[in-house]
Amino acid sequence: MSECVVRGGQVVQAGGVVSADVAIEDGRISAIGPELPGAKREINARGLTVFPGVIDDHLHFNEPGRTEWEGAATGSRALAAGGGTAFFDMPLNSTPCTVDRAAFAGKRAALERASIADFALWGGIVPGNLSELAPLAESGVIGFKAFLSDSGLPEFPRADDLTLYEGMREAARLGLPVAVHAESEEITSRLTRRARDAGRTSARDYLDSRPVIAEVEAIHRAALLAREAGCKLHIVHISSGRGVAAALEARTMGTDIAIETCAHYLFFTEDDLLRLGAIAKCAPPLRDRQEFDRLWAHVLGGIVDVVASDHSPAPPAMKTGDDFFAIWGGIAGVQSTLAVLLEAGHFQRGLRLERIAELTAGYPARRFALHNKGSIAVGNDADLTLVDMDGQENLEPESLWQKHPVNPYTGNSFRGSIRRTMLRGTTIFNHDEITVKSGGQLLRPKANTYATSGIHP
């Protein structure tokens, strides 16, 4: 007799959606099939759709050091409420930044105390820390992150071209990928300075200071350096259809490049930024309707590999001011990635459920060598999200689990109601309640087993 059976759900697998039970033993899936034998504990999933737990490969929980912005305790609860079971925390916005072994150890300890979801940690590439990349790899980072433009934090300076190239060569030797924030510093900084010197500091001026060409140029440059270095490349938060096209062109030229976008680029346009204001400020910024539609075409066409949240919260006071350039740029959305893909993707555009599972779980697990995560298969961790596809969620500030109710998604309705989230067979979220206090574990990838980009079932 199994420990647990999730009974009678519509199970989303790579090959399609099947009616099946899912048996769980010792935190792992032990069987999948119709009418499995009884278990010590049964969860009724009849009428529900069972997805693999969301793996958010790009977010900022600010732990340790800036927990007044968020923290893993509240952040991981918001993740779980959105169907998430694992996350990859970026190396900046915490204090200290994760650019050496000691910082990694401190962040790992903080997350083990506070997180209810499993986690992996990105290390950083900044000028002067090349010798720290090997110790970070030994500690267990999932990969390395670099900025081509100003990060907004002086303690995490952007990587100049030589720093990036040498970092990529070292990452390739270590068998780990490099993630890049792709915006041209030359273009964005000079346009920003020109606007501010002229006293133009509105939201429209901010949008104009970060044009699509700044993203496209930086993607091409990062791809060239990665190709020369023999490094796997991960372009984070691509905001535009032209940006995806640039990454795809690099792939055809031999760059092993993964293409990530974020839920907010698939739900909002620049018109929403002008309407909502700083709550919707991010970098790269939201784009016009043409780029929005092009980006969706790449998602629907199977070109985009992964959709993340880039959850980057801040206290309300940091999201106000007369100078739009000075306001903190980051969107809080960790609770909404699956909701966006269900509403804007499946219900509005016909995006297949198995494609949603691939974008949110299958690809990040495969790409980052988390071989027991990302899909509902025998032997994998029982990381499951149960969704009532006939339900509807009206996202209001009081339904948010993040620390501050500063969120552009509030006031919107999403078809598909997340009813339960399970991590390794344990329910961590159930019917609007968090059911555990901790339990998240560090995910350590196996170096040199990362999947090649562009490979989808």
UniProtKB/Swiss-Prot annotation:
Keywords tagged on the record: Hydrolase, Metal-binding, Purine metabolism, Zinc
Keyword Cell membrane: no
Binding site for Zn(2+) 2: K145, H181, H237
Any single GO BP term: purine nucleobase catabolic process
N6-carboxylysine PTM positions: K145
InterPro entries referenced in this protein's UniProt entry, alphabetically: Allantoinase, Allantoinase_bact, Amidohydro-rel, DHOase/Allantoinase_Hydrolase, Metal-dep_hydrolase_composite, Metal_Hydrolase
Gene Ontology terms: cellular component: cytoplasm
Cofactor descriptive note: Binds 2 Zn(2+) ions per subunit.
Domain of life: Bacteria
Molecular functions (GO terms): allantoinase activity; cobalt ion binding; zinc ion binding
Modified how: Carboxylation allows a single lysine to coordinate two zinc ions.
Binding site for Zn(2+) 1: H58, H60, K145, D310
Pathway: Nitrogen metabolism; (S)-allantoin degradation; allantoate from (S)-allantoin: step 1/1
EC number: 3.5.2.5
Description of how the protein assembles with itself and partners: Homotetramer.
Similarity-based family: Belongs to the metallo-dependent hydrolases superfamily. Allantoinase family.
Function: Catalyzes the conversion of allantoin (5-ureidohydantoin) to allantoic acid by hydrolytic cleavage of the five-member hydantoin ring.
Official protein name in the record: Allantoinase
Organism for this UniProt entry: Solibacter usitatus (strain Ellin6076)
